[in-house]
Amino acid sequence: MEEMFKEQDFWSFNESSRNSTVGNETFGGNQTVNPLKRNEEVAKVEVTVLALVLFLALAGNLCVLIAIYTAKHTQSRMYYLMKHLSIADLVVAVFQVLPQLIWDITFRFYGPDFLCRLVKYLQTVGMFASTYMLVLMSIDRCIAICQPLRSLHKRKDRCYVIVSWALSLVFSVPQVYIFSLREIGNGVYDCWGDFVQPWGAKAYITWISLTIYIIPVAILGGCYGLISFKIWQNFKRKTKKDQCITLTTAASKANALARVSSVKLVSKAKITTVKMTFVIVLAYIVCWTPFFFVQMWSAWDPEAPREAMPFIISMLLASLNSCCNPWIYMFFAGHLFHDLKQSLLCCSTLYLKSSQCRCDQEHDSRKSNCSTYVIKSTSSQRSITQSSIT
């Protein structure tokens, strides 16, 4: 049984201390970790944080999708990629954060082996998809700034997005074979990983870190290096143009200034999207760097303090990335949420007006019925009076 515990490595995408421990192994000389127990105080903090992250991720990304759907001008590539990044973040929230939250509450995985493998598979699909959509956004902004005359066709955009989702689905397949429902104690079962010893866990975690973090971050760095260089070149050219404009005549000066101002407006629009994508990338790096640092450390160092609080915090910090992006969208593309707010206000106003019209119609119909009844009763009374007189 002890050998089976040693097969379970830190790469289970579970922030709980129960899954980040290796049974009956001693870390730091005299610290023995028992996989059948957990720190209840830490578990309560994890449950609270994950519940908050789940709520913010669901609410924020659903608002982004609704705003993009209801907006008038959302045919650009940027909005298309934003939509798929929000979908990927929703996948992370529903299939990674939510199962982890339930798992932290129940302490053990209660479900069949098929569900264990499915949960582990879907947990990585969202991570791959979110990362690759972010890479696509950065490449798109790099092309828009460095080669503005080159226009990616909408079909190519769709092909790139489909390829990203396909790679996410394929790269997550090893999770199905690594994790299964296993007995970790006398009659105690949990969703546990089985790596080939002694190199299996190291190879797998290194490969995951390369495909989700190291290679994408290198691509992102290259894209923003080119973008920064191109913006610097553009700034120098505009400065020279402004100096040349001051030497022209007054008549041509107005026309030239109008042309330059229009160019500046286009550049500002592009630079705004570049800033937004850069902040999204920065948030991704801040949230995921501690996570992958911890993963690599725990894989290559058998004496890594897996139950130390910095390890737990780094795991929880990774979950925050799925709820950061909507707030970044709101800051840089506030008109989307303003349009959504206006649409909701218009819908509520129309609903109130329609309900008021229905009430007025019902009131008018009741009033007409009452007047008809009064007329009928009055005419009947007159007929009775006339008959009595006669």
From Swiss-Prot:
Q: What is its main location?
A: membrane
- PROSITE patterns, alphabetized: G_PROTEIN_RECEP_F1_1, G_PROTEIN_RECEP_F1_2
Q: Alphabetically list the UniProt keywords.
A: Cell membrane, Disulfide bond, G-protein coupled receptor, Glycoprotein, Membrane, Receptor, Transducer, Transmembrane, Transmembrane helix
Which example biological process does GO assign this protein? maternal process involved in parturition
Tell where it localizes. Answer: Cell membrane
CDD domains assigned: 7tmA_OT_R (cd15387)
The UniProt entry lists membrane topology as: Multi-pass membrane protein
- Record's Gene3D superfamilies? Rhodopsin 7-helix transmembrane proteins
Membrane-crossing segments per the record? 49-69, 87-107, 125-145, 161-181, 207-227, 277-297, 312-332
Molecular functions per Gene Ontology: oxytocin receptor activity; peptide binding; vasopressin receptor activity
Distribution of this protein across tissues and organs: Expressed in brain, intestine, bladder, skeletal muscle, lateral line, gills and kidney.
Question: Which InterPro entries does this UniProt record tie to the protein?
Answer: GPCR_Rhodpsn, GPCR_Rhodpsn_7TM, Oxytocn_rcpt, Vasoprsn_rcpt
List the glycosylation sites: N14, N19, N24, N30
A GO CC term assigned to this protein in UniProt: plasma membrane
**UniProt keyword Disulfide bond, yes or no:** yes
Going by the entry's taxonomy, the superkingdom of the source organism is recorded as Eukaryota
Extracellular-side segments: 1-48, 108-124, 182-206, 298-311
Membrane side Cytoplasmic: residue ranges:
70-86, 146-160, 228-276, 333-390
The SS bond pairs are C116-C191
**What Pfam families does UniProt report for this protein, alphabetically?**
7tm_1
Role summary: Binds to isotocin. Can also be activated by vasotocin, mesotocin, oxytocin and Arg-vasopressin, although these have lower potencies than isotocin. Produces an induction of membrane chloride currents indicating that it is coupled to the inositol phosphate/calcium pathway.
Say which family it is in. Answer: Belongs to the G-protein coupled receptor 1 family. Vasopressin/oxytocin receptor subfamily.
The name this protein goes by in its record: Isotocin receptor
Q: Which organism is it from?
A: Catostomus commersonii
Starting at the broadest rank, the lineage of the source organism is: Eukaryota, Metazoa, Chordata, Craniata, Vertebrata
